[in-house]
Amino acid sequence: MPPPEKPLGEPLDAPLDENELWLLSFYRTSEISGSLFFGKLARTLRPGPIQIDMTKHFADEAQHAWYWTECIRELGAQPMKLADAYQDQYASTAGMPANLMEVLAITQIFERRVINQYTRHAKAPGLKLPVARTLEKIMQDELWHIDWVKKALESLEPEYGRATIEETIERFRAADREVYARTMREHEERLRTLFGE
């Protein structure tokens, strides 16, 4: 059986440097954190479409953590143990979501950030083949995450009002910009090296 068509990337035997290992471990930690959060939430939701989609979302996040684990191992390393995930900073910046609508609003913003980051990473010079494959696999799910959350927020408009939902999304968008800027400053050297900036 011939090997699958290869996306752009370096040969499989290129080792991970410390910055690459950190970033892939950061992604993995974020996916684990998302899975745990959505899993707990899915257990508490009333039966219905949001509960079903939240359960699928939780399962996807767990699978993504596994994909990053496999990718790191394929590149001859072990995932780093990192204390915090990206989304852990949201609570201190924007406060804890107070209801399901706020959870979905912050999820919409976060998932868009993930897609943007993964798209940026997919264009990085010297992208390793296992990383390219992993990004490609995960981004398909991430697009669905954005779609289902958007539809779920629309379904909540009669309860919360479109204006309130839009204001909430904007509040979390501002918090995300702050968290992203802080993360970029904190890890600027690592990221500049990785993305050739």
Please annotate each region the language model reported.
Residues 1-197:
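Non-heme di-metal
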